[in-house]
Curated annotation (Swiss-Prot):
Belongs to the UPF0246 family. PANTHER family: PEROXIDE STRESS RESISTANCE PROTEIN YAAA, PEROXIDE STRESS RESPONSE PROTEIN YAAA. It comes from Streptomyces coelicolor (strain ATCC BAA-471 / A3(2) / M145). This is UPF0246 protein SCO2297. InterPro entries: YaaA (IPR005583). One of its GO terms (biological process) is response to hydroperoxide. It holds the Pfam family H2O2_YaaD. One of its GO terms (cellular component) is cytosol. Signal peptide: none annotated.
Length: 260
């Protein structure tokens, strides 16, 4: 099983250990594309601060994120599982999982990123600010920048098992599974049952809980149909729609009755 996650916008502080080594990250086929974004991002943020803030879509209160990006090559790196914070990652609570569940997380979780493309939880990265919606002056829109290298690398990473896609729209646009990989993919929405609407905070929290449940129990569905049954067994209310045509993902709605 491969689980595709969005990053968090806010991040924990960089570590005090060794700095980033791009060549040591998972999915080495993305190295050149990573280094291209990294180089331009550092250069942008080392220049005119107001321009960098505008390009990155940062408010006045997030001005300090520009300076943080200038230190990406020298800041101490930490495992991505410690860098990403926020609602989804708080609900996942990776640090509190037992050793076996952490090993499953290391194998199966892939976090998408405007800067790194995609990283595993054990990949050591510095704290950064660069969303997939950013359009860098030289490289252009990052979503478009990542499509070709992702298309080369990720089908192999997906293997022959289930792909559980929990990404938000901007990150989903960077790689869309195709063909037989798409047929093994399930996308998930979390809906407030009375209104049938997505509530952002609870959507993220529920997705984090779903991933935690799968990891903690060692549940490894072989495909989308098995995922539906597994989630129901774990206590989730799930509505599923199989694709009308082959080579397309399944669509799953997880219904929640209390928003908290």
């Amino acid at each position: 099983m491969l689980v595709l996650l969005p990053p968090s916008e806010g991040k924990a502080a960089s570590g005090r250990g060794a700095p980033l080594k791009t060549g040591s990250l998972s999915l080495p086929g993305l190295t050149a594309a990573r280094e291209a974004v990294l180089g331009e991002l550092v250069e942008l943020c080392a220049g005119d601060e107001e321009k960098a803030r505008e390009v990155l879509g940062l408010s006045e209160g997030l001005r300090g994120e520009v300076a943080k990006n200038t230190e990406l090559l020298t800041a101490g790196a930490r495992p991505a599982g410690e860098i990403y914070t926020g609602v989804l990652y708080d609900a996942l609570d990776l640090a509190s999982l037992d050793a076996a569940a952490k090993r499953r997380a290391a194998r199966s979780l892939l976090v998408f990123s405007g800067l790194w493309g995609a990283v595993r939880m054990t990949d050591r990265i510095p704290s950064y600010r660069c969303s997939m919606g950013v359009k860098l002056p030289g490289l252009g829109a990052l979503g478009a920048h990542w499509r070709a290298p992702m298309a080369e690398v990720l089908p192999e990473a997906a293997g022959d098992g289930l792909v559980l896609d929990l990404r938000s729209a901007a990150y989903a646009a960077a790689w869309k599974p195709k063909g037989e990989v798409a047929a093994r993919t399930a996308t998930v929405r979390v809906l407030h049952a009375p209104t049938r609407k997505v509530v952002s905070h609870f959507n993220k929290a529920t997705k984090g809980r779903i991933v935690r449940s799968l990891l903690a129990t060692g549940t490894a569905p072989e495909g989308p149909a098995e995922l539906v049954e597994a989630l129901r067994d774990l206590g989730y209310e799930v509505e599923a729609e199989a694709p009308a045509k082959g080579g397309r993902p399944w669509s799953l709605d997880v219904l929640v009755h209390e928003v908290h």
